[in-house]
Amino acid sequence: MADIKAIAEQLVNLTVKEVSELATILKEEYGIEPAAAAVAVAAAPGAAGAAAEEEKTSFDVVLKSAGAAKLQVVKAVKEQCGLGLKEAKDLVDAAPSTVKEGVDKATAEALKKALEEAGAEVELK
């Protein structure tokens, strides 16, 4: 049980880049689709007999505003989305704008957290 808690602690502390690498490893080496794993985990509580609403599995990350630290937000968008500097700046300047579309919940929340830490106002749709 202690091992499982240690693994959970490590997962919670992963950076966005590490989460992306983990998803790639799970997919390429073990054939596990990250979205499929999330669905399997989400389905388990419903199996206990509780009437659960269907959870949304695909999210759009929307940058509502860059806030006061626009440069930091541009850097964060550039790093997180793999864009060039000009593309990242244009995306931030066009706020409100969609940063990423159709991503799983974990990726969306990690991206939202990274952008908010840079000073942006972000929402998930």
Curated annotation (Swiss-Prot):
Subunit structure and binding partners: Homodimer. Part of the ribosomal stalk of the 50S ribosomal subunit. Forms a multimeric L10(L12)X complex, where L10 forms an elongated spine to which 2 to 4 L12 dimers bind in a sequential fashion. Binds GTP-bound translation factors.
CDD domains (UniProt xref): Ribosomal_L7_L12
Domain of life per record: Bacteria
Source organism of the structure: Porphyromonas gingivalis (strain ATCC BAA-308 / W83)
Name of the protein in question: Large ribosomal subunit protein bL12
CC per GO annotation: cytosolic large ribosomal subunit
Species lineage: Bacteria, Pseudomonadati, Bacteroidota, Bacteroidia, Bacteroidales
GO aspect biological process, one term: translation
Assigned keywords, A-Z: Ribonucleoprotein, Ribosomal protein
Coiled-coil annotated spans: none
GO terms assigned for molecular function: mRNA binding; structural constituent of ribosome
